Amino acid sequence: MLLKTINTLGLVAVVAAGAELLTGFSSPKDLVPATDGTAYGTPVVVGSGTVRSYVTYAGGEAVEVGVAMSEAVMQGLPAAGDHPEGHHDTHEFVLDMPDGNPTPFKHVGFNWNPGGHEPPGIYDQPHFDFHFYMIPEADRMAMVPADTADFNAKARSYPSPEFVPAGYVAPAPVAIPQMGVHWIDPKSPEFNGKAFTQTFIYGSWNGKLIFAEPMITKAMIESRQTVTTPIGSAERASLPGRYPTSYTIRWNERAAQYEVALSGLVTK
């Protein structure tokens, strides 16, 4: 979210775990279902459990793309002082996508924020950020202000209006390195006197929309409610594919996992 305090040279922590550590999931990377079912990306160790991306299919089409967290993830999460450099407010884990993924989302930045982040009084609750990126990871990692003028110019280059989701605005042309410019919905509850429990954000960079981001408190996820919330979407998309019209938070009892998903996918 806007105004995170991040050291761009020490942000990413990707865990390549051996099979013996991947508790809660059975296989490294599941195959794409022929018609219906769920395909998973490679599990990554987070806390005492594992996290991985997934795509769910129905009738041969992708209907949901999300992140699955095994139950044990909520135990042993790193604290602010556990970061390798000791002064960051976020821990990021990069998730690959399932093989054959038909959505425009190329990887997920899964962020745990033990003390929340700015702005104070709004997003300072312990929460998770789920960045579904529409650019390759290598391109995102290159988004650093080595050339300040060029970096700022790309931040100020907004998408054309038809590519901007309905109801969303960029409060300021300020880009977070290796993330982008964050766009908010001013009608969201947290901007209207209510406590933050969940919200949805989009991100842009260099004239294009590059990510979709549910942000959800740890307490909300652990409440095991099933909540589907409509979101604004753009008239057009720069990449063809399946795009969300809502996002869903749920506890999957059968799989014993928490799920946060971009749902109601439609073709653009």
Regions found by a protein language model. Give the residues of each.
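Bacterial Sec-dependent signal peptides at the C-terminal "C-region" and cleavage site
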Residues: 17-29
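Bacterial N-terminal signal peptides that target proteins for export
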Residues: 1-10
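Metal-centered catalytic cores of metalloenzymes
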Residues: 26-130, 134-268
